[in-house]
Curated annotation (Swiss-Prot):
Top class in the EC scheme: ligase
Descriptive protein name: Phenylalanine--tRNA ligase alpha subunit
Cofactor section: Mg(2+)
Gene that this polypeptide is encoded by: pheS
Main location: cytoplasm
GO cellular component, one term: cytoplasm
Lineage, highest ranks first: Bacteria, Pseudomonadati, Pseudomonadota, Gammaproteobacteria, Enterobacterales
Pfam families recorded: Phe_tRNA-synt_N (PF02912), tRNA-synt_2d (PF01409)
Protein species of origin: Proteus mirabilis (strain HI4320)
Family of this protein: Belongs to the class-II aminoacyl-tRNA synthetase family. Phe-tRNA synthetase alpha subunit type 1 subfamily.
Amino acid sequence: MPHLAELVAQAKAAIEEAQDVAALDSVRVEYLGKKGHLTLQMSTLRDLPAEERPAAGAVINQAKQEVQQALNARKEQMESALLNERLAAEKIDVSLPGRRIENGGLHPVTRTIERIETFFGELGFSVESGPEIEDDYHNFDALNIPAHHPARADHDTFWFDAKRLLRTQTSGVQIRTMQNKQPPIRIIAPGRVYRNDYDQTHTPMFHQVEGLIVDKDISFTNLKGTLHDFLKNFFEEDMEIRFRPSYFPFTEPSAEVDVMGKNGKWLEVLGCGMVHPNVLRNVGIDPEVYSGFAFGMGMERLTMLRYGVTDLRSFFENDLRFLKQFK
C-alpha cells in the first residue's frame, strides 16, 4: 500500500508544522477522524480477497497508531513548552526585597487597661461593667453627692434631661454591684466616662478604672498597701509615693496619691479613700459590720506618665506615627 505510506508521511509533516493545540487537533481530525484519510483506508479492504484483508487491516491500524503516537508526542511537547513559559513568567526574583508585613499593635490606653486588669485579677478582683448612660441616682445620689454639689452643674456634666446623663465616673458600677451582691466584694470597673472639659490634659471622653473592696475589717492600711504594690508594678520601679489628704463625697477619709516624677516634682495619679458609711447604707450594707475602700484613676493620665506623653489629646487623634511607637 504505497499510498498509505504517503499519507503517514504527510500526517507527520502536518503534525510538525502545527504551532498550537488547536492546529494539532485539526490534523488529528483530517487523518484520524471519522472521515479522515487514514480512517477511509479501511473501506478499501472490501476490494481485497478475503485472505488478504487481515494483513492489510493490520497495516492500516499500524499506520494509524504511528500517526497517533506522533500526535501525542507533539502535544506533550507543546504542553511542556507552555508550562515552561508560564513558569518563566511567574518566576520569583529572590534578589528583590520582600514586602514588609505591617503588624498591628494595641492602643497605649488599651495596654494600660489590660495591665491594670491583669494586676488586680491576680489579687482576686473581678471586672464589672455598667451603662454609660446613667441615672442621677447611681451617678450622684447613691454616692453621697447632694443635689447642690458642683459636679452636677451643666458645665461639668452632659445631661440628657433632669434624670439622665452620660456617666462622669464608673462609680455607678460599684453601686450596682453592691446592690446585687453581698460582701465580700472585690471588683474593678474600667470604662469610658464623660465630662465637659477639653484641653491639653482633659478630653470630653476618657477612660477610668475604679476599684472597690467591701469586707469585714478592711482598713486604710489595706488600701495603702494595695495601691503601693499596684503603682510599683505599673511603673516597674519602686517609686516614692505619698498619700495626701483630700475630699470626696463617697469616701471618708479620702486621699489623693502622688508619685515623685523624674523632674523631682510630685505628680497626682489617683484618688482613693474608705467607703463612706452613707454609701454603704444606701445599698443596704451595714457599716457597723462591713467596711471597704475605693479608688479611681484615669487611664490616659497613667498612660501619659508611663510613656512620657505630654498631650492627652494625642491618644484620640489616630496619628499612626504616634501610635506605632507603642508596638
